[in-house]
């Protein structure tokens, strides 16, 4: 299973990556953030720099990453991601780990 963590620079993403590593997660951890110096990038197997969640092109970039990295599960970790992704949840059916908008 390949997991995509959104907003890799925040404490929630950092904690999620650390927890996955602690249990010897047998999959790929991919992270995204708009900040090229995001701390989560250094803990992930791969990473991508994307627009901010409320900017144009954000959803399209996520889909490019989903296809390129064979993502099975998306884990939004910031309030901006949660709002944007939940408003577009119909585009990600079966891949989201979050409640409905």
What positions do the PLM features span?
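Surface-exposed amphipathic alpha-helices with a cationic face
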Residues: 10-24, 66-67, 86-89
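Extreme N-terminal starter segment of soluble prokaryotic enzymes
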Residues: 1-4
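A short, GP-enriched loop/loop-strand-helix hinge that lies immediately N-terminal to
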Residues: 71-101
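Short, polar loop motifs at secondary-structure junctions
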Residues: 32-38
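Conserved beta-strand positions in the Rossmann-like core of class I SAM-dependent methyltransferases
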Residues: 28-30
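Conserved N-terminal Rossmann-fold NAD(P)-binding element of oxidoreductases
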Residues: 6-8
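Short, structured coil segments at secondary-structure junctions
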Residues: 42-44, 91-92
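Glycine-rich, highly charged phosphate/nucleotide-binding loops
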Residues: 46-65
């Amino acid at each position: 299973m390949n997991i995509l963590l959104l907003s890799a620079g925040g404490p929630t993403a950092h904690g999620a990556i650390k927890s996955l590593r602690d249990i010897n997660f047998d999959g790929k951890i991919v992270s995204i953030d708009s900040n090229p110096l995001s701390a989560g990038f250094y803990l992930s197997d791969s990473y991508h720099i994307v627009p901010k969640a409320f900017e144009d092109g954000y959803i399209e970039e996520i889909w490019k990453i989903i296809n390129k990295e064979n993502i099975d599960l998306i884990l939004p970790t910031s309030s901006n991601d949660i709002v944007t992704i939940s408003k577009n949840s119909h585009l990600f059916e079966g891949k989201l780990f979050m409640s409905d908008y």
